[in-house]
């Protein structure tokens, strides 16, 4: 649940890339004929060394935490059957048809299914709470969530690798073959919402190709997940009796249930509704595919004008983003607290 990493206003102005064997060979020849690159500058070398040091420190902290973990079995590099909801484990073992039958399409391009066992959700939350109290550095998920933690920094990298490889990718490959068929890395984190902290999250798209979102608990009211349309969706006015299909048109509101997952493309606009009471924790996995990100399909999405800016049906108010839509105030008044959040996000703070 975070802002898109590619600036739309810059993306749709970019020229369409054209690839050919001749062009590739010409580039290869130019590379061979060009002088060797100069040695890195002192500034570049210092930046690389600083990044390497931070990475080594993160690995060391993760190893330190794993050595005294509350539930050591959670750090296994293989998915354990007891981690999964029985129905999901059976679907994984039943082949493609069983997997497809297990996932319910609750809205166009949005799939819900039981995934994690209640015991796994409870133990993972307990482990992450223990890490928060351990005194070790906590890596926050992104610029839009002030609370939560990146799971790799807690030592869960191999666990999440296995979860992606054995559970997420087999289903994503069936539902989203272009975006999810060849995922090769991920960014996985936990987010939390409660009164006095983050209440919800503004409308956005994710910096992912496929997003998995699983509720871990606890008790709460409100805090739904609202879906609108896809980046680059048609802005044409709907026919009589049909719903508009633009990026900023309402599609579906999901009610979170412990252990139940939502799977969708990263470019599907969505936002976390404000929590009314209690506290909600969710496991988020952003899956990314290097091959898809080099494809014309991926690049073309950011050459399109932002939805609903060139005529067509007006946006639904619930689908407006005060941090991302520069025309927000043409439709809604911007409250002072939202103005402060928008200004902070644009400053990168």
Identify the meaning behind each predicted range.
Residues 36, 111-112, 199, 271:
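Residues marking the start of alpha-helices
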Residues 146, 183, 194, 312, ...:
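Alpha-helical interaction segments
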Residues 71, 75, 79, 84-182:
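Non-heme Fe(II)/2-oxoglutarate
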Residues 62, 66-67, 71, 76, ...:
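Short, functionally important structural connectors and interaction interfaces within domains
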């Amino acid at each position: 649940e975070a802002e898109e990493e590619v600036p739309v206003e810059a993306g749709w102005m970019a020229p369409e890339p054209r690839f050919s064997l001749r062009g590739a060979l010409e580039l290869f020849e130019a590379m061979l004929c060009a002088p060797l690159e100069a040695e890195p500058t002192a500034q570049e070398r210092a930046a690389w060394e600083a990044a390497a040091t931070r990475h080594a420190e993160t690995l060391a902290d993760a190893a330190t935490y794993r050595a005294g973990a509350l539930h050591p079995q959670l750090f296994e590099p293989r998915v354990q059957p007891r981690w999964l909801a029985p129905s999901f484990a059976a679907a994984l073992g039943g082949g493609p048809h069983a997997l497809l039958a297990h996932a319910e399409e609750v809205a166009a391009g949005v799939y819900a299914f039981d995934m994690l066992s209640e015991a796994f959700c409870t133990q993972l939350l307990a482990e992450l709470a223990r890490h928060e109290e351990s005194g070790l550095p906590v890596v926050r998920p992104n610029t839009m969530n002030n609370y939560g933690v990146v799971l790799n920094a807690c030592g869960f990298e191999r666990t999440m690798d296995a979860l992606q490889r054995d559970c997420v990718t087999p289903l994503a490959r069936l539902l989203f073959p272009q975006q999810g068929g060849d995922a090769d890395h991920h960014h996985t984190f936990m987010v939390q919402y409660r009164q006095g902290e983050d209440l919800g999250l503004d409308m956005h798209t994710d910096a992912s190709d496929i997003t998995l979102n699983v509720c871990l608990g606890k008790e709460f009211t409100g805090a739904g997940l609202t879906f609108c349309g896809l980046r680059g969706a048609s802005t044409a006015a709907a026919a009589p009796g049909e719903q508009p299909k633009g990026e900023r048109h309402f599609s579906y509101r999901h009610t979170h249930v412990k252990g139940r997952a939502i799977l969708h493309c990263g470019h599907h606009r969505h936002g976390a509704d404000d929590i009314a009471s209690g506290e909600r924790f969710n496991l988020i996995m952003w899956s990314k595919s290097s091959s898809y990100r080099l494809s014309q399909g991926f690049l073309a999405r950011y050459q399109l004008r932002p939805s609903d800016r060139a005529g067509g049906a007006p946006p639904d108010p619930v689908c407006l983003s005060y941090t991302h839509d520069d025309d927000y105030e043409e439709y809604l008044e911007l409250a002072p607290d939202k103005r402060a959040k928008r200004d902070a996000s644009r400053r990168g703070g």
